[in-house]
Amino acid sequence: MESDAGAQQPPEASENSNMYGGYQTETESDPLVYKSDNNHNPGSTNLDGPNSIVAQTEPNAVSERRTSVLQQADDVLPRHSSIDDAIASVARQSAGFSEDFLRRDSRVSASHSSHNEAGHHADSEQLETRLPVPENVQEHNNVSNTENHESTGAPADDSFFSELASRPETSEQFFSTHAQEEITPLVDPLQEVDERRESFPWEESKEGADFFSSLGNSEHNQTPASGTEEHEQSHVSTSFNEEETAITHGNEESIPWPSYDENSHEAHAQHTSEGAQETDSVAPSAHTVHESDSTPTPKPDSTNELDELFAGDDDDFLQEIVKDQEPVTSNGNQDTKTPSSQEPEPAEESQVKKKDSFAFLELDDDLLLDDDLLPDEEDEGEINSNATVVQPQTTTTSRYSRPSQPTSTSSSFSKPVAAQEFNKKLEEAKKKHDAYDFPSNLLHSSIKPAPRTNNKYAAPSGSAGSPNSASASAPPPSSTTSLPLHPQAAPGVAQENRPPLQSHSSAPNQAPSKSPAKKSFFEELPIPTPRAAVRPARSGPSKPSPVTAKPAVGQAQKKPTQPPVNPYAMQNLKTPSAASSPASAVPQVTLPNAPVGPVPPVAPIGGVVAPGPFSDMASVAPLPQSAPQNSLSATPNTTSQPRKLSNAGSSPYVPKVGPYGPSGHTRHHSRASSLVGAKGKEVNPYAPALSPVNASGGQMSPQNQASSLSAVAPPTAHSSATASRLRRISNPRSIYGNAVAQQLKPVDPNIRFQKQFPIFNWGLNNNVSMIPKNMQRNINIKQLTGGAFTEILKSFPGPLSKKSKAKDVEKWLKTKVTHLDSSTPNVATNEAKLSDEVGEILAALVASNGDVRSQEFISTACSVLNPHHYSQVEAMATPQGSNHSATAYKLDNSGSNQLLTYCQAGQTDRALELCVAAGDWALALIISHSMGPQAFGKTASDFARTSYPFQKSQSKLNHLMPIILKVFSGNVKSIIEDFQNVATELEWVLLHWRDVVTSIAANAIQNGKVNEFLNEFGQLLASHGNFIGRDVCFILTGAPLSPSFSVVGGDSQMGLFYTEIYEYALSQRSAATANTLLPTLSVKLHHAQLLADYGLNVDSQRYCDQIGASLKTTKQQVPPAIIHEFQRLLVRVSDTGANDQSWYGGIGKINKMWGQLDKLISGDENTEKKGETGLFSKFSPSVSRNASTTDIHALDRPEFHSMVSSMSAPITPGEQYGRTPSSVAPVTSLSGVSSSQTSNPLTSVPRYAPPAKNSRPQQSPQQPTRSHDMAPHSGSRYAPSNASSSNLGNPEEAIQSRKPPSKYSRPAQVGAAFSYNNPVAEASSSSIGSYGSHAVPNPPPATQGHTKQPSFNSIVSNDYSVIRDHNRSPSVQSDISLDYPVDFRERIAESKQESEENADIKQLNEIPTNGNGNENTQAQSSKDQSSPLPYANQSGTTMDSTEVASQQSQQPPPPPPKLTQTPTQSPSRGPPPAVSRSPSQPPKANPYAPGARTNKPRGRNRYGPPSALGSNAPSVPEVNGNRASEEPKNVNPKVHEEKTSNIDDSFTSSYQEDTQMSSPSLMLNHNQGAINQTERPNSKFGLGDEFPIPGSPEVTTRANSVYGGHGGFFSSRLSQSQQSTMYQQYEVTDDTVQDYVPVVEEEDEEEDAPKSQSSQPAQNGSKSAANAKGQTGLFSIFGMRKNDGKPKPIRAKMGEPMKLVYDEEMKAWIDPSIPRDQQLKKAAPPPPPKMKTSAKPSNVPSVGEAPSQQHTPQTGPVLPPGNSSGPTPKPIGSGPKPPAPRAGTKPQLANANLDDLLSLSSQPGAAGRKPKRGARRGYVNVMEQ
């Protein structure tokens, strides 16, 4: 078409022109063009075709590409109504243009491959393939090249554009690409160009047209990827010179664009990015020019206008290009073009509207520069061959060329030959029309944004080889300018080449990176060759990445201002911001890839420049302003693979980034996320690490990214994707390494605190703690309502026993069904139904008292299982006579005769065979029955099989009848075999098991085989998973519970109840004797746990009681796991306070009884003890006492330390059996840890091992530990060290005793008692004393072989001490000794000081030494003459004397009795005297500690008499209590033997010579005096005088009650052995009562007054005894009594020896250990109440009167609680001697037995006395006065 026609073409034509050329960004009439200009970098001309143009239409990268394409389109396309017309016009005007242009372009493409590979080469290749290249193209190119700066453009031939039109990538493709790139409506640039046509004289000249066409080709080849659109547009519009024309027509190398400085190139790059729009606007002008060439409408001012345009340009870029032809062509062109574009801007301002069409020239300059960079390597020769003029220009490398910018260099052809052919075609077309030498193919190639070169990713590519050089090296693949046509183009190459398509923006960038990295880059790329075919399309875009490094930098600088590109936004979407910065599109890509400022592109791995990281993104939206993007790509791109990021960004599978989306994040983001394994959304799109991902081929180098705008077009994206994938392969690590690192960044470290599994926890009550997964730490507490099940659980009348009422069980079963039906009305599962049926059957069984043979039960059970059957039976009429003939076979006469013959002969077997063979089953059955059950069963089975053969039908007759007949016949085994062998039978019975069960069970009464069948059938059902059916079968048979049948009713929760009910029903049978404990133990335990879970702790405790009681009596082996769970449940329930009503909580009731007994004996009433049911009532006092038993004041005592050190030495097993301690025996340091205990536990004797024959009393300064499990073991964290359990008699210990105590050891208290338990075992066991003296507990030693194996009960209670045949473990004794308040013991000590000391000394003398004089002991005893031996608190053997000593230490020491200690005294067999405390020693803070004393007595025993206020009566017999106050003398060993014989071995056998497992009952010998205190102390209760009534539960500790006593599991009472021992020990005999003075109520108080006065000491003594007695009790164990250091009432321990001695002189019972004066003081009784005076005064109280006046320790009244805190009365040890018994009716108190004592109170007075006036009228409670 004519140029005029083109000038006047309608808007459609202009739009089409815009589509291809992207010219006139100013012409907003064409939305596509305008956007193309804005978004498209001039250097990134849409060599890929319209799509590429569209991609360039994006604000930044798109603008570059589009600008270059549009400008080139301006050069090539005339202003016609359509592109086809423009092409035809150009082809007609310049027939040889295409050919010449193609020839030149082939060379240019070589240079273009690196500079404008994605640009012009793709287009030229497409033109070559699609357009007939006119022969005059070469000629025209030469002419255009020779035309230096002539403004006259060579006329473009329409044939060229015809060829363009013939390309598949026409306007439609362009629009498709634009559609993808969000091209906003643009003003039709053609219209504006038409308006400005007259100002373009070159349009009229063919030369001008050719010039512009060639220039357009060059520009397309060199489309700078950097944002030089602006400069190029202005330059093109203002200063199109003949040089430019020549350059345009010639190859890039030959294009003589004026070279410019790098600064100008950078500026040009910036302008290119900015002027992409201008370039686009110029491109239309170029089209106009070409069009004018086609329709010669010469503009006379064309040349002048060109001069004006280049007037500001001092450098003749065309000449410079000619000088530096090659370099300038590739890089120099860009650089030169950039200045030209920069300089023309001023002129452009005046002519911008008219000369916007020249923008493409500017872009073309960049492209030419890019081409020059490329031709430097390959295309130079080609270009020279194509165009002589162009070659020299191309040869001259532009000074601005940069090898580091390979992006700009993109070969226009994949192959040089194709490029030459294409040049020829172009030249031919240019001859016809030189206005637009960039066909749509070229536009496709513009996909790659040139500005990407600046991208730090592109910069590395430049280093590897400038994109120009790279593209030049790979021109063949990238030669075609239409990048979109060749998605295969290498990512690095194609992307680098793409920027050249955007030559305007990329040219400057290409210049810096041109030659160095051109060839090397593409040569290194393994991709170029495979992409060669594709590269023509991508070649243009590929070069932008390297070349555009600078433009990218400039654009990158612009990009930061723009919002980050959305990686998922459409690339075509164009925003005003994007439009405002067209060149920034390229910077998008380049910015991330290249650092700010021109950075030489880093050579990609393999020498190939990687495509721009975010090419597509850049094309999509201006990434330069997105700082995050920049940061993303900055590091990775600069380092190595900038292009990879671009590729990653342009992945065809990744949505195009919107104008606001970060460019290049599209692909790399997803890739990074995939690498990290996190969700794509979690990946930070701005993370620099993500940018390196070039995975998406769609993304190209920064320059390519500009062209990647066109990459939005499917071809471009595909090519870029391919390139990116290849690039990705080349350097995966660099791409993904950073991405992974940065993707890890967004991970929230607190995610684990927010996203967790729900937390669910059952509380002790109805509370459930649950934290749902999505709750934000908000805890909502809701009441757990179990619904119907909770009601069922609460209402269950368990635990069931024989005493339970059957009606309650039946009622519960009915209520259960009601609750379940109401709670789950819609739930009618088979299992629920079966469960209900089981419940009904059990109810019937309970109603029948467990008789499974009861017809009522069987009928009920069968009706429950098969109700319909029984309803039918009832409806059936009674069978009447039948008229039907029998169908049975019958023997004929002959057969009958034969049968008769057999029967007569006795051959019944043959007769049976005859009947069976004849089918006469009646006779056969009868005969077989006579032969026995086996024959009968076989015959019946044969009959059933014959009559009812196996069938597959579901008929009951054929299946059920044979079963019944076989059962009747007793052939049960064959039935089960049939079930197992015949599948149909098994299937039927499993489905109809109810029918089978009911049919058989209904006949259970008549046939004994029914149970056998039901059992077998039940097992068969269970083997097939029908457990409820099995349970029904077993219930019907009355099978006992067994391990295989331990749960009734299946595994549901109802099974807990059903099992217990079934057990209960069976127990109702009189014959039910089987112990079902073990089978149901786990069920009951689970039931108890379930109750505890639901907060029903009381009910749970009842189950625990039952289980514990059963375990006590069972002889079966209980699994340890069950025991462990049971113990845990006990502790759990006891902690909730539900054990008040527990099986051991009943102790309170027992205590009440004991209290009544105390009241009866002592005549005192106990007020209710406060706090006995308080919060801490359940805690054993030992817990608190242990912590407070340390006597700080005794720490520095040497004697104390000596004792502690001696005690710290453990006794070896050798010592235990009389051997001296071995030299290797472990020595326990004061720290309580034995060196050998830890290393060799066998060296230590077990705690419960029987003591050695030579075992010596051990001193436990502290209180004894609790017994059983509650007692801290040495290995327990609560276990005190064993330092105090050493043998004082041991010489080594004596040596140790002199050693200073360890800083870790806690010194034993002075008043500590010696324990007589097994020293060796005690070394292993812990005691409170040891606990006090040692902070570090000793590990429990290994059990020795001599120890007894624990019984089941002991295992259950974890207490081996429960196993003892009168050999009580010390811990048990210690438990009881804990109950005795220290104050009381102190008071006792005071009262019996003398006697105890004497007795102790005697005992020590009696005890033989181990061969080593116990000088230590002697010294201690000599020091402590006034202090008796302390109680053996730890071992439970209480030395009253020692306790008294400790007590006396609290009080002012009375004058020491005459005590002589022989130097041979040895504590080896007796307790060594304890070191007495100094009187000044402050009382212990712990009232419970031994010897601790407070003004108030601590808690008193609720059931025991209150502590005596005013007496320290020697209620506790001395060791030598029988002796008077005379001086102690050596007692003969017999005393010791007797003593030991009376000692309760169950509490301590350490004092016994032989480890006797039991000791004979203690016979209190009056001749010998009160049994030595060590005897009674040996009792488990520590204080002999405090020993409670045998079996009194008060003596038991909570540990014993909780964890079991000796009697069995968690026994709350003393074991039988303990009780028996106590009874034996305290067996009452006549002589035992010598000290017992019952209270006799005198009817005549007046008469009793003098007696009471005279016998007051005896009363005080009895009071003290009663006080001492009252100290023992359950509450004393729990710390409920007041232990204030004052003597407490002592319960009467009948049969227990007393240490009081009746003094004839004083006429009173005195304590030899206490000075008489003191006793006399205290002996004065309070005045009796005023009663009628006695007529007959008595000077000496009679024996009968003594009880009323003298209260012996055993019978002394118990002080009321109020008086317990009063001052302590003085002991009455020095009371008057008892008078000689006078003849009277009353029995002598000394010889009175218990009955006599009890009768004294009710016995009438002496003869002649008045009858008793009141029940207690004569009783005087002295303690209350």
Swiss-Prot record:
InterPro entries hit by this protein: Sec16_CCD, Sec16_Sec23-bd
GO cellular component, as recorded: endoplasmic reticulum exit site; endoplasmic reticulum membrane; ER to Golgi transport vesicle membrane
Topological relation to the membrane, as annotated: Peripheral membrane protein
Gene3D superfamilies named among the record's database cross-references: 1.20.58.940
Short name of one Pfam family: TPR_Sec16
Keyword Magnesium assigned: no
Span list, region Disordered: 1-67, 106-356, 371-590, 620-675, 687-726, 1165-1188, 1206-1308, 1322-1353, 1387-1696, 1712-1825
Comp. bias intervals (Acidic residues): 304-318, 371-382
Biased composition (Basic and acidic residues): 114-128, 193-209, 262-271, 422-436, 1524-1542, 1681-1696
Record-level GO BP terms: autophagy; Golgi organization; intracellular transport; protein localization to endoplasmic reticulum exit site; protein transport; vesicle-mediated transport
This protein's UniProt keywords: Autophagy, Endoplasmic reticulum, ER-Golgi transport, Membrane, Protein transport, Transport
Compositionally biased spans, kind Pro residues: 1469-1485
Subcellular location: Endoplasmic reticulum membrane
Highest rank taxon of the organism: Eukaryota
Polar residues: compositionally biased ranges: 39-60, 214-226, 272-282, 294-303, 327-338, 500-513, 626-650, 693-709, 1179-1188, 1279-1289, 1344-1353, 1406-1445, 1543-1576, 1651-1674
Low complexity composition bias: residue spans: 391-412, 458-485, 576-585, 710-724, 1227-1239, 1255-1265, 1324-1333, 1459-1468, 1611-1620, 1789-1808
UniProt similarity note: Belongs to the SEC16 family.
Main function: Involved in the initiation of assembly of the COPII coat required for the formation of transport vesicles from the endoplasmic reticulum (ER) and the selection of cargo molecules. Also involved in autophagy.
Protein known as: COPII coat assembly protein SEC16
Species whose genome carries this gene: Meyerozyma guilliermondii (strain ATCC 6260 / CBS 566 / DSM 6381 / JCM 1539 / NBRC 10279 / NRRL Y-324)
UniProt gene name: SEC16
